Amino acid sequence: MSTSTRQGSRLHAGEPGAEPLFRLTRSSERERGLDQGTNTSGFAACGLDGQLQNAPQARRFVEVTLNGWALQLLVPDATLVVSELVTNAVRHALDPAPDASEYPLWLGIFLRPGDLVCAVSDPSSTPPCQRNPDDSASGGRGLNLVSALSDSLHWSLTPPQGKTVWATLRLPAKAA
């Protein structure tokens, strides 16, 4: 296992007024040619309807995409990271009433030099909150897992509404 500098157990918000990492909308899906799903260009995204079954759907999407990009070594960590980010968005970022949007959540994964970025956009502007649950708690460890598995964990507001939470994973030496 390669060593890397991790950002640790904190979320790093963007600078005030900074542009979000990315924001996906239904219209941008068509603009980016993503209506076909995964691709080999190093960018793939899918809309999620905000249901609890989105976590396994997201894991499968990431697995298929990374296998297509010949990044099988990242599948275990990336699928767990994405599963936790999607689960947090479903549990904490959606109103109980159905959102008017067909896809209130968007999952995007893309390659940057040396990194894989896994990002989830949701309609809530409430910042994500890392917790330190006691040993008997049955939940509250998701972002801690993401921090432990990733090289960095960030979030930013995505005007006009919502936020994007993303984690980066270092690419294997051969892929970087």
Language-model segments: residues:
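Helix-loop-beta hinge of the Bergerat
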Residues: G33-P76
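Conserved terminal C-lobe alpha helix of the protein kinase catalytic domain
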Residues: P56-R59, E63, T79, S83, ...
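Conserved beta-strand-loop-beta-strand hairpin that lines the nucleotide-binding pocket
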Residues: M1-A44, V90-A176
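Conserved ATP-binding N-box helix of the HATPase_c
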Residues: L73-A97
